[in-house]
Amino acid sequence: MSYSAFVQARDFLQAHRTDYETAYRDYQPPQLTEFNWALDYFDVMAKGNDRPALWVVNEDGSEQKMSYSQMSQRSNQVANWLRGQGVKRGDRILMMLGNEVPLWDTMLAAIKLGAVLTPATTLLAPDDLRDRLDRGQVRHVIIGHTHTEKFTSLPGDYTRTTVGGAVAGWQQLEQAYQESTEFAPDGPTLATDPQLLYFTSGTTSKPKLVLHSQQSYPVGHLSTMYWLGLQPGDVHWNISSPGWAKHTWSCFFAPWNAGATIFIFNYSRFTAAAILETLVRCSVTTLCAPPTVWRMLIQEDLRKYPVKVRELIGAGEPLNPEVIDQVKEAWGITLRDGFGQTETTAQVGNSPGQPVKLGSMGRPMPGYQVRLVDMDGRVAEEGEICLDLASRPIGLMISYADDPEKTAEVMRDGFYHTGDTAAIDADGYITYVGRADDVFKASDYRISPFELESVLIEHEAVAEAAVVPSPDALRLAVPKAFLTLRAGYEPSRELARDIFVFLRSRLSPYKRVRRLEFGELPKTISGKIRRVELRKGEQDRGAAPRGALEFYEEDFEF
């Protein structure tokens, strides 16, 4: 029953993939009491299914291609072996693996067992891992064999398993592939049981623990499938590192919900040319990448690459209009934007076949009632992006684990509060303004950092930009831009003047960036700019002298 209900909802969205109005109006999420996505959907769909489910290509030319049927059987073997290692329903497993087949085996196996998976990036340092082990109440650790030293100073009552090599004191996951390919669950799984525990990237505070259920991500990501425009047989490439929610979004649930192939290209060092060549060589049909990657790709001559893609998507941070324009000019395909969080699936997006308004993230996705709420708690044309809890979306998290106060803070007054602000127009298109704590006032005018950053990266020398308030005796605060430059450009007084001139011709006087500084931008390990760090640095600097690469608009005559 759960399989047919899930597939019926999926098929409805795929049948209306270019008919947004019908999809949004008539979509009914499946109502499930018991549901285990890996057993009740994936295994049923995978039985006798020889279509490719996973295709991993390495930069040395080697590759692995696994069918749906193979992934079902391999994950059964891993589930049986993990059960033998003591993994029980509800146990928390920290998984820190690269883009390798055992990662997908382990994720499927954990779901089948009813365990709670805590994905972690391989970039984590021992102190970060200690935090995850302690706050995440981890009972089992599964990691790549090259990372075991990070755990030497992390004692604890957890089982230890490696992938890829033998290490003293650790079990090897490779032993699992001697187990039976048949798996029997120990009982039913409730749709409300916990499934995933994610640590957020911490752009503004200490990482929070986001707890998702057996339906919130698996079923909720039907909205993500719809936004991406995925169809059966697609070769879908999502450029994202394991350990982050976006990897689970688009390298696990969304493509497999659609019956598509997950494509992975493993490289030691990012180069735009290698990405574009792989895109062509492997006939990728749908590509999703963060704005940072898109900004690097457009520095190549995209017209030299005869891609076969149908859908292009940006995710992770808002897309700047300049990037969308350049991709459209080169390939004739509209790069589509969207919005979601670790706490949810895709909430807002420009869906396939719909008119795209430059600068807008699109419209609410099927299954989401999105409202903009102002400072007085009223629904408005500009305000915080909120979800109406009267029709609570399936894709919303259960809670912040072990933090009822924080959960109550974001789920108050009948809304889930995202902490992001936006504006909505008469057609229902939503335009991102910024994090609620990023928007600031200068001379009593509200300033959106994202708007100014979008203009800044239109300058030929600017690769990335972050705008924060800088204290000013007269205006209280003025916009200051921190800039990294494209290859071939060096910071200088002359370049600073040229950027100020460029901005004066494109921004109203009250919006102008009055100060700028060249240098590297602080980022989280997931690649998001830590504006909170830049903002705090400005607040704390006091009367400290300017840096050698810092310039004020007032230094120049125009």
Locate each region found by the language model.
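AMP-binding/adenylate-forming catalytic core of the ANL superfamily
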Residues: 124, 131, 141-144, 287, ...
